[in-house]
C-alpha cells in the first residue's frame, strides 16, 4: 500500500488548484471516472475518496485521487489513480523528470528491488509501461516511511480523525504508462489490499525483509505463496485492462500471459473460493457460533 503515486506527483507540482470531479469523503461504487475515456471498474463495495487534487504547474496539469474501502473501520483495500497531461510543454525536461521519477527514485520505482515480487517493464526512449507487484509493512510505510517526502498529511489526518485502523501487512501493485506517441498523457494506478480479503493466512512476520510474502521467503510458506499467486493473477489481469482502458500502443504492451489466468481459470478459482467460504460458514453454524439467520445472511452475501 505504498503511496508511490502521490510521491511521484510531488516531484512535479507545488501549486494546487481546485479539486476535480470527486470530493473528499464522497462515496463511490462500481466505476471511478477520471475522465470521459478513463472509467475504472472498482472492486465491489463502497469506496471513500480520501484525497482529491487537481494541480497545475507552468502548463502541466494533473489529477490525483486516493480511495479506500473499509470493513469495521479498517482499511482493507486502497486505490490511487492519477493522470498528468504533458503534451507540448517543455518536452525534453518533462521526459527526463518522468524518467528519473520512475527509474531513479532510490526508494521506489520501476526497477528490481529486494522487496518487489515481480517487475515487468517496457522501456524505450521516453516511453515506459510498468507493472510492479510487491508486499509491504503497511504501518511502517505509513508512520515512518523510508522516503522523507512520503508525507501525505491529508491522508494521515483523515485516518486519525476517523479512527481508522491499518493492516499490518499489505499486498500491492503499481501500474504506469507514458508515451509521447500516445497524446502525451502519463497514467499511474496502484492498488493495495489486506491479504485477508483473499483469505490469506495469519502473518507471523511483519517487516518487509522477514515477511512470509518476501520472494526469498515465500517458498517456505505454501499458504502465503498461494495467496500471492492469487494477487499476481489479479494484478496482471488488472494491468491488461489498464492497457486497454488507456489504449496502450500494441508494441508497448507487456507480455503477461504467464501471470494472468484465462477467464475459465479465474471462474474456477472464484468458484473454489466461494465453496471454501461457505464451508467455513457451515462449520461456524454447526459449532453454534452463528445462528441459522446469521448463516443464511452471510451465505447470501457471498453468493451475491
Descriptions of predicted regions:
Residues 1-4, 304:
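Positively charged n-region of N-terminal signal peptides that target proteins for export
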Residues 4-13:
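Sec-dependent N-terminal signal peptides
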Residues 15-19:
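Sec/Tat signal peptide C-region and signal peptidase I cleavage site
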Residues 20-119:
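N-terminal Sec/ER secretory leader and immediately downstream segment
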Residues 85-261:
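Mature extracytoplasmic/lumenal regions of exported proteins
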Residues 263-292, 296-304:
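N-terminal J-domain/J-like co-chaperone modules of DnaJ/Hsp40 proteins
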Amino acid at each position: 500500500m505504498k503511496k508511490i503515486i502521490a510521491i511521484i506527483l510531488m516531484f512535479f507540482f507545488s501549486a494546487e488548484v481546485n479539486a476535480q470531479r470527486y470530493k473528499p469523503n464522497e462515496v463511490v461504487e462500481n466505476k471511478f471516472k477520471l475522465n470521459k475515456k478513463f472509467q475504472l471498474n472498482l472492486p465491489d463495495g463502497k469506496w471513500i475518496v480520501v484525497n482529491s487534487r487537481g494541480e497545475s504547474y507552468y502548463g502541466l496539469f494533473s489529477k490525483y485521487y486516493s480511495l479506500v474501502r473499509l470493513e469495521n473501520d479498517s482499511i482493507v483495500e486502497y486505490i490511487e489513480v492519477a493522470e498528468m497531461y504533458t503534451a507540448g510543454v517543455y518536452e525534453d525536461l518533462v521526459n527526463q523528470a518522468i524518467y528519473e521519477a520512475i527509474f531513479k527514485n532510490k526508494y521506489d520505482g520501476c526497477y528490481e528491488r529486494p522487496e518487489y515480487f515481480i517487475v515487468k517493464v517496457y522501456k524505450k526512449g521516453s516511453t515506459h509501461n510498468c507493472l510492479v507487484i510487491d508486499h509491504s509493512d503497511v504501518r511502517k510505510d505509513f508512520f515512518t516511511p523510508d522516503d522523507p517526502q512520503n508525507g501525505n498529511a491529508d491522508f494521515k489526518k483523515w485516518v486519525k480523525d476517523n479512527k481508522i485502523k491499518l493492516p499490518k501487512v499489505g499486498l500491492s501493485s503499481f501500474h504506469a504508462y507514458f508515451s509521447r506517441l500516445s497524446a502525451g498523457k502519463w497514467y499511474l494506478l496502484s492498488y493495495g489490499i489486506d491479504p485477508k480479503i483473499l483469505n490469506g493466512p495469519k502473518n507471523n512476520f511483519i517487516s518487509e525483509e522477514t515477511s512470509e510474502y518476501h520472494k526469498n521467503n515465500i517458498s517456505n510458506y505454501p499458504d502465503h505463496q498461494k495467496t500471492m499467486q492469487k494477487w499476481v493473477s489479479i494484478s496482471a489481469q488488472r494491468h491488461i485492462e489498464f492497457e486497454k482502458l488507456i489504449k496502450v500502443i500494441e508494441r508497448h504492451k507487456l507480455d503477461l500471459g504467464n501471470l494472468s489466468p484465462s477467464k475459465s481459470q479465474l471462474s474456477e478459482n472464484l468458484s473454489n473460493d466461494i465453496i471454501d467460504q461457505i464451508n467455513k460458514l457451515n462449520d461456524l453454524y454447526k459449532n453454534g457460533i452463528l445462528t441459522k439467520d446469521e448463516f443464511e445472511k452471510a451465505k447470501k452475501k457471498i453468493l451475491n
